[in-house]
């Protein structure tokens, strides 16, 4: 059996974190946890888990590793620990696929679909500057787009604020047309009081879904909100464990779950969440605004899950809109995009060859990313 012998971590600006595992047979596996604004903390968590549980152990025993990393401590769950587990889990799957010369989707039971429809994130914070990008991506064949819609918003805000949000989205709908799915991200910025008003104002635009219509800490109120609107509701970017998704699905109120392969327990975690979603007739739309390793892992899970709606694609993976992080950090062209769909890499493991020289050149101890702090007119902190 191949044994894990070594690991390295690389933080790449603006907010990417990569984990490299190596076995005694020379197989290298890559994982991509997410540091967000806390990459140094996630890094420390990974180091602790690797030293205490993984180095020197069987590289193929993925399920045992997952259970040990998750249940082996008295405290489990949360964004830091689950991000650390996610990166390790991805890298172990990459190793196992390479060991058996199989793509990861074959380790998950095989593909249920040949390709995944892409949902292209197009920005939209503060003021909606996304219409030009939307036009570009639709011209390129994309059939689903997602935009942020609410910037700073009070707990109880004015009719004019609601109207501005609706008008901005109406401009986007006019740009993309009715043959394109338009998803709206409220980013958890909206209070319970404002969410029904905004969802009602958006109903005539027929969005694919409204993402994080309320802050995830208040997801218990999603069934109440769902009963007040015809708009499908989505959440999951900031839900971290399969059991947390199970409780949310059992309560109802969510139409689309959006676990991140870099936050919700890696491939193992998101695979479980996808099965739970299918058992509740709920769609899966994996959330992956990160780099090529996580994107590949997400495609593998999404290709084998029963009810995948589409795969989110980050803005900086889009040609012509800044550096293409997929091209920057990979060798060759692991992803093919055609007619609004992404191919699933079919090489061994995750099917992505990381450009180690480029990665080492760009890596830092801490990527240095910090989320912005927004404030209301009175000086109080607003939700970003």
Q: Residue spans of the language-model regions?
A:
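Metal- or metallocofactor-binding catalytic centers and their adjacent structured scaffolds
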Residues: 24-99, 318, 382-384
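Conserved, mostly hydrophobic/aromatic
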Residues: 4, 26, 50, 88, ...
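Flexible C-terminal active-site loop/helix
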Residues: 6-9, 13, 19, 24, ...
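Shared catalytic-loop signature of beta/alpha-barrel
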Residues: 44, 48-49, 64, 206, ...
């Amino acid at each position: 059996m191949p044994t894990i012998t070594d690991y390295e971590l690389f933080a790449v600006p603006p907010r990417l974190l990569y984990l490299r595992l190596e076995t005694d047979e020379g197989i290298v596996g890559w994982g991509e946890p997410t540091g967000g604004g806390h990459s140094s903390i996630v890094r420390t968590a990974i180091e602790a888990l690797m030293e205490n549980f993984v180095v020197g152990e069987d590289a193929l025993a993925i399920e045992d590793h997952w259970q040990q990393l998750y249940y082996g401590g008295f405290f489990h769950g949360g964004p830091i620990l689950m991000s650390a587990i996610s990166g390790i889990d991805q890298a172990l799957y990459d190793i196992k696929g390479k060991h058996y010369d199989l793509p990861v989707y074959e380790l998950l039971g095989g593909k249920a679909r040949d390709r995944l429809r892409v949902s292209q994130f197009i920005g939209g914070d503060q003021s909606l500057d996304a219409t030009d990008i939307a036009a570009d991506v639709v011209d390129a064949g994309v059939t689903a787009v997602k935009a942020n819609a609410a910037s700073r918003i009070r707990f109880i805000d004015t009719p004019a604020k609601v109207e501005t949000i609706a008008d901005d989205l109406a401009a986007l709908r006019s740009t993309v047309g009715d043959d394109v799915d338009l998803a709206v991200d409220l980013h958890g910025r909206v209070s319970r009081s404002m969410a029904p008003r905004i969802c009602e104002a958006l109903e005539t635009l027929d969005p694919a879904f409204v993402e994080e219509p309320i802050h995830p800490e208040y997801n218990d109120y999603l069934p109440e909100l769902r009963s007040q609107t015809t708009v499908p509701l989505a959440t999951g970017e900031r839900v971290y464990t399969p059991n947390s998704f199970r409780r949310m699905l059992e309560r109802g109120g969510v139409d689309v779950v959006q676990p991140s392969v870099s936050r919700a327990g890696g491939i193992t975690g998101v695979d479980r969440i996808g099965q739970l979603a299918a058992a509740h007739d709920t769609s899966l739309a994996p959330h992956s605004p990160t780099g090529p390793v996580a994107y590949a892992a997400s495609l593998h899970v999404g290709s084998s899950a029963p009810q995948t709606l589409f795969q989110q694609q980050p803005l900086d993976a889009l040609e012509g809109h800044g550096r293409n992080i997929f091209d920057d950090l990979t060798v060759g062209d692991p992803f093919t995009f055609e007619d609004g769909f992404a191919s699933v890499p079919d090489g061994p493991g995750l099917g992505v060859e990381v450009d180690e020289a480029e990665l080492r050149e760009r890596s830092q101890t801490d990527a240095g990313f910090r989320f912005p702090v927004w404030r209301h007119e009175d000086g109080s902190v607003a939700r970003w």
